[in-house]
């Protein structure tokens, strides 16, 4: 590994260059070099977040203000935990803001996640038959915010990956419709590809405001974007059984 000093406009930057080790693919070397030089990765290490993804939800909340002290948050696909960390801070789950109400944060992921102070974490396959009932039991009431950063393992085929993540978003949205308080917020990561249009239409029927955002922390070469649906209309907006 080597470093190179570059300067511009009076500032010096230190860029890390990674040599391709024996047995390591060039693509792996380039990924590692990008990680080591990514300002969000560097910032996350300094500020104690578990990954650069924390800044995506920070930037979304800075823009829309859905994480409030006293709020009840469910984070689906929470590994490695950056979104939960942000939620804990913003809803005052640790009670560090003495003059503000304390919120709660519940995280769920297929993978095991290291404990996060102020959050309740469970390992669970959210697509299993009884998953939503389990999560509702752990939640013990309604939620103000449901966030989903769920993603299926990459297949290498963009169309397939797009359809898989849309299916996860639809499952998360169905759960949100069931647990959100009226006026609540749903936030989810999607991959652009066309199939998200039906999801958008569904959300617009159930929320007063739906926005598609690519926050600065989302890499420019990524097809990911985030849907932020605010102002949940409530379960009364759903058709009654037998209604056409």
UniProtKB/Swiss-Prot annotation:
Subcellular location: Cytoplasm
Keywords annotated in UniProt: Cytoplasm, Methyltransferase, rRNA processing, S-adenosyl-L-methionine, Transferase
Catalytic activity: uridine(2552) in 23S rRNA + S-adenosyl-L-methionine = 2'-O-methyluridine(2552) in 23S rRNA + S-adenosyl-L-homocysteine + H(+)
GO molecular function, one term: rRNA (uridine-2'-O-)-methyltransferase activity
GO cellular component assignments: cytoplasm
A Pfam family the protein falls into: FtsJ
EC number of this enzyme: 2.1.1.166
Enzyme class: transferase
InterPro entries linked to this entry: RNA_methyltr_RlmE (IPR050082), RNA_MeTrfase_FtsJ_dom (IPR002877), rRNA-MeTfrase_E (IPR015507), SAM-dependent_MTases_sf (IPR029063)
Gene3D superfamilies associated with the record: Vaccinia Virus protein VP39
Residues reported in the UniProt entry to bind S-adenosyl-L-methionine: 81, 83, 109, 125, 149
Active site: 189 (proton acceptor)
Major location (coarse): cytoplasm
Function comment: Specifically methylates the uridine in position 2552 of 23S rRNA at the 2'-O position of the ribose in the fully assembled 50S ribosomal subunit.
HAMAP family tied to this protein: RNA_methyltr_E
Similarity comment text for this entry: Belongs to the class I-like SAM-binding methyltransferase superfamily. RNA methyltransferase RlmE family.
UniProt name for this protein: Ribosomal RNA large subunit methyltransferase E
Gene for this chain: rlmE
